[in-house]
Amino acid sequence: MTALPLYFDYAATTPVDDRVIATMLECLGRQGHFGNPASGSHGYGDNARQAVERARQQVGELVGAPAESLVWTSGATESNNLALKGVAQASDMGRRHIVSSRLEHKAVLDSLLELQRQGFDITWLEPDAAGLIQPEAVSQALRADTLLVSLMMVNNELGTLTDVASIGQRVRAHGALMHVDAAQATGKLNIDLRHMPIDLMSFSAHKTYGPKGIGALYVGERARGALHAQIHGGGHEQGLRSGTLATHQIVGMGSAFALAGAEQAAETARLGALSMRLREGLLNLPGVHLNGCATHRIAHTLNLRIERPGFNAAQLSSRLAVSSTSACNSASTAPSHVLLALGLSPAQALSSLRISLGRFTRPEDIEQALEVLESAVKAPPALW
């Protein structure tokens, strides 16, 4: 069997931690918590419901949110759809204006384009030269009819940060709602929704060493009653998301978020050192440049532009698992919309790589990656 390449695509997805798998197995099979959590007439349902609510508490503890403010979804894409379309469809105040940016994930961009087709007016903020959305730019975009502002906390392609707390204060003072996509932030940044002016926040398990197919949406007090369900049929999750709850996946998300909280400080320091070694080694190579702000970013993700004649990122695939764009766009050969928004040319965007580190990245992996990339960057261009 051909050996798999070294994994440097943690921003696309993370492997499920073995400790998380163990908790999920407790919910499968005849001896597990296999009951329907909505069945309150017997112990099977009670046990499953208790497991679900324990997981809800675990997620809430990581992000500083009351357990009852969290709605289970199938992932951050559904959470984003529920937040954006749910708020828009519930609006009866004549507010038809939404503010977002060109840097957002496709789950946000495409949802907003759909709302635009339905008659909503969308203001698309442009990033500054460092690839950041500044609070002042948001303030300037706010209007009397602004309903919602939606921005990501950590950019999935660049690893850059948005000051959502400062922006949220401005949005709240204006009387609009603030939604944040935090799929790339959990376990990496401190999030305390008790003290953040955020009304809606989207989460994903599979970006945090949990299973795919499960996520959550935080619905703050200001957003309650201002959200229309997108999936109907049973009134589950306070009427906001119908469907039988997947106990094993939910328990996996709770376990993953609990582990992320317990290990965040140590893991951030460890990955910071590994990332610095990788970054310094690569930026010393000819023609290699960092895309996005060098300071306001998480250590886990690097986006590098390699401007060398003949460099072909596809040649790396047998040795390194990296991305040239978001995983949701990888089937397309078009350049990254995020990199184009930064002002890069299509050729520059196509010569860029996203390298993302994670829990199972070892120091020796960094050294091997440096060897592979140095060889690829310095290789002479092909003559045919």
Can you annotate each of these PLM segments?
Residues 1-384:
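Pyridoxal 5′-phosphate
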